[in-house]
UniProtKB/Swiss-Prot annotation:
UniProt keyword Membrane present: yes
Keywords: Bacteriocin immunity, Cell membrane, Lipoprotein, Membrane, Palmitate, Signal
This protein's record includes keyword Nuclease: no
Primary gene name: nisI
Localization in the cell: Cell membrane
One biological process term in Gene Ontology: bacteriocin immunity
Lipid-binding residues (covalent, N-palmitoyl cysteine): C20
One GO CC term, this protein: plasma membrane
Organism: Lactococcus lactis subsp. lactis (Streptococcus lactis)
InterPro entries documented for this protein: Spa1_C
Lipidation (S-diacylglycerol cysteine): C20
Function: Involved in immunity against exogenously supplied nisin.
Membrane topology: Lipid-anchor
Protein name: Nisin immunity protein
N-terminal signal peptide: 1-19
Length: 245
């Protein structure tokens, strides 16, 4: 009986050691001062500039999370953001449908390759991403002339009837937290004091009015924030696209 107990303890110890080794063996560790080069599975890899469509991304191989702030000009890592920096949120390594590997970066997926292929394939470029100031220094504002539009970074975005699914939603950006009643044709906001009034001809003014409860704003996976984003309207997320595109 004693031998049996000793054998069980020994087996548990071996299993525990192998489990710990497997976990550490698969960790992702970025090279010091680099946002593209890293170690995975005891091998050197780099993040390429080749984007993988979301529909081609399958299961995750290893889960991790890392936030890096990179200066756009010097490409040096920073401890805090500035007006010329890019914030990269790197998380998880995935297997693609063709069995290649990719990494999640800012709601997109970029192919990773062994470091030996670096001369033949371009590494990830910071130009693929918005500078930090584009997101943090400007607020989303409902247009004062048309409640169906959003003013962001000096550009106008039109809110469409197209629904954005939960799977398409990217990172949280802002919240509007406002209710507006506006003319259904012109989009002009109607003052709260006039919401319940009756028109001179006796018809109910609400018949040509629309009420929107504005909520959160999210980026959309695979799209630049300056191109389009999702706005929560009456508990559904609607697509807002840049006017003039």
């Amino acid at each position: 009986m004693r031998r049996y107990l000793i054998l069980i303890v020994a087996l548990i110890g071996i299993t525990g050691l192998s489990g710990c080794y497997q976990t550490s063996h698969k960790k992702v560790r970025f090279d010091e001062g680099s946002y593209t080069n890293f170690i995975y599975d005891n091998k050197s890899y780099f993040v390429t500039d080749k984007e993988i469509p979301q529909e081609n991304v399958n299961n995750s191989k290893v889960k991790f999370y890392k936030l890096l702030i990179v200066d756009m000009k010097s490409e040096k890592l920073l401890s805090s953001s500035n007006k010329n920096s890019v914030t990269l949120v790197l998380n998880n390594i995935y297997e693609a449908s063709d069995k290649s590997l990719c990494m999640g970066i800012n709601d997109r997926y970029y192919k990773i390759l062994p470091e030996s292929d670096k001369g033949a394939v371009k590494a990830l470029r910071l130009q693929n991403f918005d500078v930090t100031s584009d997101i943090s220094d400007d607020n989303f504002v409902i247009d004062k002339n048309d409640s169906r539009k959003i003013d962001y970074m000096g550009n106008i975005y039109s809110i469409s009837d197209t629904t954005v699914s939960d799977e398409e939603l990217g990172e949280y950006q802002d919240v509007l937290a406002e209710v507006r009643v506006f003319d259904s044709v012109s989009g002009k906001s109607i003052p709260r004091s006039e919401w319940g009034r009756i028109d001179k001809d006796g018809s109910n003014s609400k018949q040509s009015r629309t009420e929107w409860d504005y909520g959160e704003i999210h980026s959309i996976r695979g799209k630049s924030l300056t191109e389009a984003f999702a706005v929560e309207i009456n508990d559904d997320f609607k697509l807002a696209t840049k006017v003039g595109n």
